[in-house]
A protein has these predicted regions:
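Catalytic-pocket segment enriched in acidic/His residues
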Residues: 50-173
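Short coil/turn connectors at secondary-structure junctions
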Residues: 8-9, 14-17, 36-39, 88, ...
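Sequence-level detector for tyrosine residue identity
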Residues: 14, 41-44, 52, 140
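Short, structured patches in soluble enzyme cores that scaffold and shape functional sites
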Residues: 7, 16-24, 42-47, 75, ...
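A generic local secondary-structure boundary/capping motif
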Residues: 3-12, 18, 26-33, 60-63, ...
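Generic structural signal for residues positioned in beta-strands
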Residues: 2, 19, 40-42, 70, ...
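Short Gly/aromatic-enriched secondary-structure transition segments
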Residues: 30-42
Length: 173
C-alpha cells in the first residue's frame, strides 16, 4: 500500500526506524529483563508531516495523518538477531539515493532502555509496536529540504530484517 502525501501539506518526510514488537504483557521492566517481552523486530517508516509537527510543542499532530507511516513487511523473531537488535544498519533510500545510513548501536537509547522507560508509563501488551527513533539524514534537515512526493519510491532497510518498500501517492478523497 502506498504512503500518502496528505492534501493538507506537501511536507511528507521519511524516517527509517527499528520497530520493536511486544510479545508478552510487561510493566515496570528493568534493564535485566526488558528484552524478555520482545517477540521480534521489523522495519518502520515513520512518515512525518513536518509543518504540522511544528504547529505545537508536541510532534504528535505531524505523526498521525492517514497512511503516512508504514510497517513491515517482515517480523523477525528476537532470537534471530543480536541481543536488543544491537549493531544493525538502518538505512533509507529515496528513488535509489541513500539518504539515511545509521546503526542501532548509535541510538540515543537502546531497545532495553526504551522498554524500561515505556513500561514505567504504561503496560506493554502483546502486539504493541514501539519505534525507536531515526538516524541522521531526514529530509527536512537537508539543504535544500527533501520531501517525498507522488511517484517516489522509498525504501527503509534494517539489516537482518529486510526492506520495507513503499511507493508514494497523493491522498485521494
Amino acid at each position: 500500500q502506498p504512503m500518502r502525501v496528505p492534501k493538507a501539506s506537501s511536507k511528507l518526510d521519511y524516517e527509517a526506524e527499528l520497530a520493536v514488537v511486544i510479545g508478552k504483557t510487561a510493566r515496570h521492566l528493568t534493564a535485566e529483563n526488558a528484552l524478555d517481552c520482545v517477540a521480534g523486530y521489523s522495519c518502520y517508516n515513520d512518515g512525518s508531516i513536518r509543518d504540522y509537527q511544528r504547529k505545537g510543542t508536541q510532534w504528535t499532530l505531524g505523526k498521525n495523518f492517514d497512511l503516512t507511516g508504514s510497517f513491515g513487511p517482515w517480523l523477525v523473531s528476537a532470537d534471530e538477531l543480536p541481543k536488543g537488535a544491537h549493531g544493525l544498519k538502518v538505512q533509507t533510500r529515496l528513488n535509489g539515493q541513500l539518504l539515511q545510513d545509521g546503526n542501532t548501536a548509535d541510538f540515543l537509547f537502546n531497545v532495553s532502555q526504551v522498554l524500561v522507560i515505556m513500561s514505567e508509563v504504561m503496560t506493554l501488551e502483546p502486539g504493541d509496536v514501539i519505534i525507536t527513533g531515526t538516524p541522521a539524514g531526514v529530509g527536512y534537515a537537508r539543504k535544500p529540504p527533501i520531501f517525498m512526493k507522488a511517484g517516489d519510491i522509498c525504501e527503509v532497510e534494517v539489516e537482518g530484517i529486510g526492506i520495507l518498500l513503499n511507493t508514494i501517492a497523493n491522498e485521494v478523497s
